[in-house]
Each structure stands twice: as C-alpha cells, then as structure tokens.
Amino acid sequence: MKDNNSGKNSLFREENEEEVLVDPYGRKVTGLRISITDRCNLSCMYCHNEGAECCTCGPVGNEMSPELICSIIREAAKFGVRKVKFSGGEPLFRKDFEDILACLPPLKEVSATTNGILLEKRAKTLKAAGLDRINVSLDSLDPEKYRKITGAPPGTLEKVIRGINSAVEAGLTPVKLNMVLLKGINENEIDEMMDFIRPYKGKVILQLIELMNIDPELSKYTIDSKTLEKSLEERASEVRVRHLHHRKKYMIDGVEVEFVRPMDNSEFCAHCSRLRVTADGKLRPCLLVHDNLVDIGGANSPEEIEKLLRLAVSRRKPYYTPIMKIEKLKKKKE
C-alpha cells in the first residue's frame, strides 16, 4: 500500500498491481458467500441458515434484487474477490437465479449449495448462465433416515439423486456431496455413500461435515471426529492437505473424501477469507456474530457499495483464537 494513499485505502493492499481487501488482522477477503433467499423447502434438523436466527419460508419482498447482488459482486471483484458461492435457504427458490449468474463479472469460480430437489430441471440452464460447479446436501441414501434428517416428504430423495445426475451431465463438476454426520443416525453410511459416488469417476466428491455445535440439543449427535479421521487416513492411498484451513482430502478406493470441521475453531478463523451477505442485504463480517452487520440493501451507487464493503471488512475479527476458545469453553462449563 502506498503511503500517499494510506488514509483513504487503509483497508486495502496492493498485490500484483491490484488492490485487495484486507481486514485489521491481515486476512485477505477473496471470496463472497451470498445467501440469495431465506426460503427453503426442507427443515433440516441441524440447519444454521447461514447465521440467520432461524430457517424460514418467508416472503420474497425482503430479498435482494438481481441488480443489487450483481453490483455488490462487481465492486468486490475490483478488489480481489475471485470466488463467489451462492446459498440460502434454498437458492433454487429464486426463479431469477440464472439472471443473477448471467450478469456477473469474470471470476475464478462461481458455485452454489443446494438441497438438490429443484436441480434436475435447471442444471443445464444454471451452467449456461455461468455457474461453474455445485454442492448438493445429501445426508443419507436411506429414504427413512433422509426424511428424519430433512423433514422431506416421500419421493424427495429420488429427486435429489436425479438432480445430482443432471448436474454431472451439465458439467457442474466436481459436484460436492455435503454429508453432515449425525451420531446414531447416518455415521455408519459413509461406505455406502462412497459406493454411490464411485461410478461417477471423480466427477463427484464426498464432503463429510462435522456437526456445527450451535444448539445444545444437537450435541448428542456429535461424532468422534478423531476416530473418524484416523480411520480415513488408514484406508487412504493418498492424503492431501488443502492450504486453506489445513483441511484433509483422502483418496480411498477411487473416491475423494474431504473431512470438514465446523467453523467454531481457531484454525478456521485464522484463515477465513470470506465475507458473507445475507438474503435481505446485510454484510456479515463473521458467521457467528450478529451485532456487527452492515446494511448494504439500500446502496444505490458503486461508490456507496465500496464504502460499505470497506466498513464490513474493518469489522472482521477472528471469533475464535486459541485463548478465546478456552475462555468460551470455561464459560460454558460455568
């Protein structure tokens, strides 16, 4: 960062002749995770709804317009943001999702997370509009267990599987299957899920997700992650480590398996590079903090959007550090 711009650009640094968003702790913001709706057609037992207070099938009126979403992304892209992930709620509830994708600036990767129910008929149009790849939530291949976890009506699981097939055919690959592990419900289905994925020959990846501990009522479903990781490592022919969060990938009998720890750890916070946007137009510096949001919903110019992006980045602070985590655990015990 040049000295003569130190006042104006205190939250930016120049890298390869490009200014990038950097928070007060030196963490670059290179990605946006944008919730484009709070509406959903499932009621998953573990859902945190991207930090919103609750899951909802509420009104459309408070959702950001395609124009605002694209304006936010365009401004962020000017300052080094290269990856965008769309989520919800269920993003495919937005009938104008393809319009949003079509107006985006050039980016390294555009992805989305979906429950897959509406994916079958839209996979091709999403790909044509600019979506690069997709994550699909699939916690069980057993219809009864799937219903218990998601609250879905009969026949829903079959729709999701057809959606996965359509996504692969459309080229939204690699498709990542998000499987939240729940003790006593689906933790014994990992091998079955790997068998399901294997015929896709690398076009589908399994992401095993440790339950995020945000509700004491769900603590009984938390798995023994250390035992699981040890088992995966013993079976793997190769283990790779992703630079971000030091997340491990295991190659097991032709299937790529990635283990995703919850966000309530210091490793995640130390490497966090994302800024989140809520469905009603608020910048969320941290998923786990609710009182530092920046309202960008009323922004009507690129300059105003840039100003609000800077403000949100200035409020980014690691929620967990090793010391903070110990203190929080002590408070819980008290």
Swiss-Prot record:
Gene Ontology biological process terms from the UniProt entry: Mo-molybdopterin cofactor biosynthetic process
EC number: 4.1.99.22
Domain Radical SAM core residue range list: 24-256
EC class: lyase
Positions bound to S-adenosyl-L-methionine: Y46, G89, S137
Catalytic activity entry: GTP + AH2 + S-adenosyl-L-methionine = (8S)-3',8-cyclo-7,8-dihydroguanosine 5'-triphosphate + 5'-deoxyadenosine + L-methionine + A + H(+)
Stored PANTHER family: MOLYBDENUM COFACTOR BIOSYNTHESIS PROTEIN 1, MOLYBDOPTERIN COFACTOR SYNTHESIS PROTEIN A
Name the record gives this protein: Probable GTP 3',8-cyclase
Organism: Methanosarcina mazei (strain ATCC BAA-159 / DSM 3647 / Goe1 / Go1 / JCM 11833 / OCM 88)
